[in-house]
Amino acid sequence: MSLKYSNTTADYLQWGEAMNLVRSLYKDEDYKMSLLIAIGCFWGLRISDMLALHWKQILNVDEFTIIEKKTGKQRTIRINQQLKRHIADCYKQIQPIGINAPILVSQKGTVYRVQSIDVLLKKMQIKYKLSVKNFSCHSLRKTF
């Protein structure tokens, strides 16, 4: 819930700033969030579709197909080499329980909720001094 008369429209992240954020998060050993930002910016998926992804779908493949939750449409996504390397590096660092595991799992072992991701993004905005206003999950989709 937002404050009355407040602007809640998500803003996009500048591409260079987004890529710097991906690198900074990786360097700071926040591999899951680095992967989330990279996937969100490169593929333009809705957060509900990103949270539903599993490692077996995206690891060591050139493309994959999903059914979008909101629209029910089938979408084929190609993975460029730069992102493919980043996914493999994050997989090695995160060390998930298996290839069938979801890619975005919290410390509790459950898939993140959208609200939790939004809170983490707002903390990231402050920590990394991002120039984007109203930074949220949808900002990643708009950056695409």
Where are these regions (language model features)?
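Basic, Lys/Arg- and aromatic-enriched nucleic-acid-binding interface segment
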Residues: 2, 12-43
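C-terminal catalytic core of Y-nucleophile DNA break-rejoin enzymes
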Residues: 7, 69-89, 100-122
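Conserved tyrosine-mediated DNA breakage-rejoining catalytic core shared by Y-recombinases
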Residues: 17, 52-85
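Alpha-helix N-cap/helix-start motif at helix boundaries, enriched for small hydrophobics
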Residues: 36, 48-53
